[in-house]
Structure formats: C-alpha cells, structure tokens
Amino acid sequence: MKWTFKNGKLVTIKADKNIEVFKKYFEKISGEKDRIGRFIIGLNPEIKPQTIFDMMALGAVSIAVGYNKDIGGRNEATAHHEVTISNATVKIDRETIIENGKIKL
C-alpha cells in the first residue's frame, strides 16, 4: 500500500489489491479521517515483526490517519486506520529518510 500526504493530509491511496474494500470502509468514516494521527519509526532490534509490538521493531514504520485524541492529539474522527509496514520506505519532501527499513539520516 502507498499513501501520499500533503500538508499532513492523506491525498492518495494506492494498493496492489483490495483497494476498493479499503475505500468503501474509508468513505464511511467522518471527521478528520485524512489527517496524520500517529507516525512511529521502529527502533528496537529485540522486537520481531508479526507481534503485538511490531510497530516498534527495527525497520518498521507505523502510520495512522484519523482519530488520535486518545493519545493527546487533536484529530476528531469516527475512527482511525493504522498500517504497520516492515522494511518500509519513507520519503519526506522527496528525501528518503528510511529505505527498506534502514534509517538514512
């Protein structure tokens, strides 16, 4: 899945499969569903992917959009959606900061 953000808002969603299912789910959410709610870079080499803590595993990236008041945020929405990706690539302003799970900074 590829999410593209501009000014903190989700502007495009692409996926190889099941994109229509996700879009139907996403359309039903109201409020600030397209605002970044959480962004986590996993730094812990002791945590393995596919566990309850996989968002903290070294090389993982977790990003959520929508509701985040439960963690001190300001986004008001009827839900939030979070994706955790192992060996992720993250670009900010066209600069790659994480490539295949390796921090480039």
Model segments located where?
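Metal/cofactor-centered catalytic core regions of large enzymes
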Residues: M1-L105
